[in-house]
Amino acid sequence: MALPILLDCDPGHDDAIAIVLALASPELDVKAITSSAGNQTPEKTLRNVLRMLTLLNRTDIPVAGGAVKPLMRELIIADNVHGESGLDGPALPEPTFAPQNCTAVELMAKTLRESAEPVTIVSTGPQTNVALLLNSHPELHSKIARIVIMGGAMGLGNWTPAAEFNIYVDPEAAEIVFQSGIPVVMAGLDVTHKAQIHVEDTERFRAIGNPVSTIVAELLDFFLEYHKDEKWGFVGAPLHDPCTIAWLLKPELFTTVERWVGVETQGKYSQGMTVVDYYYLTGNKPNATVMVDVDRQGFVDLLADRLKFYA
């Protein structure tokens, strides 16, 4: 039986590819998709969800727009990474359907209530919507199987020296998620920076030759340009968000550890840092499964295999 999931995202090139991967995978039942501000402004990320679902001919999936800003801070966006639209590069279709007439939290709550079994929440943007759901609907915590997030890092940040972008945008929300008591799976930069897509991988996707694989290749063409900056030392572009979906499909591709994670909300230099108690120094019980390594070739092969679904 397919695993029911709720996808909360802020598309964003890698979010868009996570949607493509999820909807090409019969093991997953995508119940709804919600959008958050993050990689771009809230109206643009919502539009990008609708554009992607129009492209994939999945306008049956309920969509709702979420929080327009973080819980306690002003919004930061990553337009330098994702461009003016949030999905610069390919020519994507205009949306052919409208979002639900409700908020992201309302759609999430409705989806959880109506599901016969606990639902996995996959969150690939800032954690604002998920935190609002947890705070406003404590009665639904038992309907959440786990929360799989792309965010954080044990080591280096990518937005500040200490912080990864998604967590930095709304650290208070991320702290609520990690301390919720619900199992959290963290795909942080420690693993996503190893999940790099090289130029030859992009050409492999393009050669699959269907409209969706072509769009994915064009998304990656644009995404790679930002990551060519020598400061990163990358061979390709790290495909952060699809690591969450890939872990659900093939957990054997990933090495994980069980650790306690907290989020720094106050620090002078470290706001948004995910503090991972790797050596069990705090005495706190582990609250997260933390991804630390990935079989890069296996990850690329999975993407290539699932892109053939759209032939």
Swiss-Prot record:
Pfam families: IU_nuc_hydro. This is Pyrimidine-specific ribonucleoside hydrolase RihA. The keyword Endoplasmic reticulum does not apply. The active site is at 240. Keywords: Glycosidase, Hydrolase. One of its GO terms (biological process) is pyrimidine nucleobase metabolic process. It comes from Shigella sonnei (strain Ss046). The gene is rihA. Hydrolyzes cytidine or uridine to ribose and cytosine or uracil, respectively. Its EC number is 3.2.-.-. Belongs to the IUNH family. RihA subfamily. One of its GO terms (molecular function) is uridine nucleosidase activity. One of its GO terms (cellular component) is cytosol. SUPFAM superfamilies: Nucleoside hydrolase. InterPro entries: I/U_nuclsd_hydro_CS, Inosine/uridine_hydrolase_dom, IUNH, Pyrim_hydro_RihA, Ribo_hydro-like.
